[in-house]
């Protein structure tokens, strides 16, 4: 479906992103596509990168972090098979873009960010857009959020060396976790399902994320 000739500015950029970056690469979940066609990615991007807000690559955000490529965001959301009644945990809030998408798809979202400055920025963005079903927490995302578990879906937006046991334990039976696992330089993106208390994993793609720093992630650089 081609973008409407009546669209301009960021609305046109969003429509082109949906058509050329997502639909043409096989994203089919209409709820995911509708959320990404509606939520203003430019609100979560540093001002100088506004012209590239819908470009087909990651963008820098403060403190050496990144906002992921739109296709990877869509791939993760689609793989998670999020239902409207689901409770979701996101690890790695960044400036809040993926949390906003999750808030449009799920009933309740908890998102953890290690950097207090980014967590505060995400809260501002999400409150500005009127979200009331998203809680932003500052902390070690690799440990999850045990006092709110279990979660139907866990999305991890930073790379881990191995599957963190804490996150798997906090996943509901039948739940899905989408997570990049591997070296700091290159990872495999997996969808993990919890069936009869066991981990069943399927590789989706190769990918590259910033490392998740934490007790069950990577150690801080010395």
Swiss-Prot record:
Catalyzes the methyl esterification of L-isoaspartyl residues in peptides and proteins that result from spontaneous decomposition of normal L-aspartyl and L-asparaginyl residues. It plays a role in the repair and/or degradation of damaged proteins. It holds the Pfam family PCMT. GO terms for biological process: methylation; protein modification process; protein repair. It catalyses: [protein]-L-isoaspartate + S-adenosyl-L-methionine = [protein]-L-isoaspartate alpha-methyl ester + S-adenosyl-L-homocysteine. Its EC number is 2.1.1.77. One of its GO terms (molecular function) is protein-L-isoaspartate (D-aspartate) O-methyltransferase activity. CDD domains: AdoMet_MTases (cd02440). The active site is at residue 68. The gene is pcm. HAMAP family: PIMT (MF_00090). Keywords: Cytoplasm, Methyltransferase, S-adenosyl-L-methionine, Transferase. Belongs to the methyltransferase superfamily. L-isoaspartyl/D-aspartyl protein methyltransferase family. NCBIfam families: pimt, PRK00312.1. This is Protein-L-isoaspartate O-methyltransferase. The lineage of its organism: Bacteria, Pseudomonadati, Acidobacteriota, Terriglobia, Terriglobales. One of its GO terms (cellular component) is cytoplasm. It is found in: Cytoplasm.
